[in-house]
Amino acid sequence: KLKRSLKVDAVLGIILLGVVALLTNGTLPAGEIQNVDAQEIIYGFKTVEFTENAKFDIQISPFSSGVNTILVKVSDFENNPIYDSNQIKVKIANPSKNISPIEIPMQIIKDNNNIPVEFQGELTFGFSGEWQLEIESQRTENANESKILNVLVKPRLENIQTQIVEYEFPEKAKPLYPLYDGNNAIWISDPSAPRLWEFSLDTQEFSSYSFNGLSTMFLTMDNTGKIWFTDSPRNQIGYIDLETKEITTKTIPKLGPVISDNKPIFIQADFDGNIWISIVNKNKILKYLPDDDVFKVVELPERDSFPFALSIDSDGNIWYTATGTGKFGKIDPNEGKITQYSKEIPLEGPEFLLFDKNEDVWIAEHTGTAITKFNPVLETFENISVPDEEALPFGMTFDRYGNIWFAQHVVDSIGVYDPDNNNLKEIPIPTEGSFTQFMTSDKNGKIWFVEQEGNKIGTVNMIEIPVDISQIKTIDDVEMKYTEIASPLIALGIIFTALFYVKSIYDKRRLNSLINS
């Protein structure tokens, strides 16, 4: 009996070793798993919507511009057919483009007394963007059930063909920060000289405007169309009147401790035309009221905060990054109240921030090689790591599809992240040693970036590639994943290990019993 028991133990041991070998050799390294996940593109849109008395199961494939197939199941909340309904109306519209609702012909493809009625139709999204979808279940004995939802149709990053076009400055400069003025021109600061550059999007020509100072660093536009700038070495701010092209400057008062000079860095206009300036070395943010010619001081709550970037939300609050403490916060412009936010582990070099259409805050962690999304309502963080550990992500902006683009400072490529599909991609910059730090978007959502060492301004031309339906993978495709194999095997391994342990105790006692007898 003992001999037979040992044989069984040996066989089970070999099986367990085989399972361990399978799990070990079948696992990709952590980085490779992330790469595979990032490269996997799944097409399609699927949602469940409810009305007062009905449930709509909606699927759209491939969910891209062009021809799509829509499937709709209509049922009650228990997934039973609605007894007095066997017709459905589907309409699509695009109010932003003045496209009125267009009815989509729908046909019944499944009609059984025991399952919900399923309808199918063919709809065409003429272009990417936000579309309005209206679905109405027509009933004979009750009021119709209808649902309206907005759907964002956009290409995946792999379906966007990009081409970078560069324009060289007419003379040697150190272009830093670009700003779109809303009138088909990009304005660029120049830390190497007291001047502002204007780049015409119509003619692709440069113009420069000089003033009495030392440099221009960061730019903002107020509600009257003036473009303001910081001149850090001269401790002043200024603005250019876009009609007359005249530049006016204003000296910033000395701030304590006066043993060191002020270092004004970032600048941001609010909705009332006031100008906010971060003083990076004095732990202060200034509010300048042009009408009263008065500076007000906002003292940050922690020493060595090193306030850097500024931005404004839809309520008019001024947000800032505190590079020294790894935090960020907002200032109520009326009450002056400061609210600070931080992760359990402080952010690494937060040096730029901006808001998306949902009022989420995006923060570039300059030394943390990541961009981080912060939800101000839930106060939650989502971290997106960039592929290159040397990248130093910096300035950010959004394209017409809602993708977030970010500069990578010391790497000759710019990054783009699709927050709707959780996909990230890098676009190489042709110029070597470009040193790209900041970027902006024009009214068409076209990306523009500045190459400080390349002495160029660049843009990204994007062409949407049609989706080949026959070659795509949809959300309904079934695939055996590694975790689906590994999890049961690991569980079995734990169970068998426990059984081995119990059996070894039992065998030891039995052997002791035999020896003693």
Question: Over which residues does each language-model region extend?
Answer:
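Beta-rich, blade/repeat-based domains predominating
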Residues: 170-182, 212-223, 255-271, 302-315, ...
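Cytoplasmic C-terminal tails of single-pass
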Residues: 508-517
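Alpha-helical transmembrane segments
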Residues: 493-508
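Blade-level signature of beta-propeller repeat domains, shared across WD40, Kelch, NHL, RCC1
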Residues: 429-489
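Conserved beta-strand positions in repeat-built beta-propeller and related beta-rich domains
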Residues: 187-192, 229-235, 275-281, 318-325, ...
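N-terminal soluble domains immediately following signal/targeting peptides that reside
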Residues: 21-29, 37-162, 239, 278, ...
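A short helix->beta-strand "capping" segment at the edge of beta-propeller domains
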Residues: 158-172
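Short loop/turn segments that connect beta-strands within beta-propeller blades
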Residues: 200-204, 241-245, 288-293, 332-336, ...
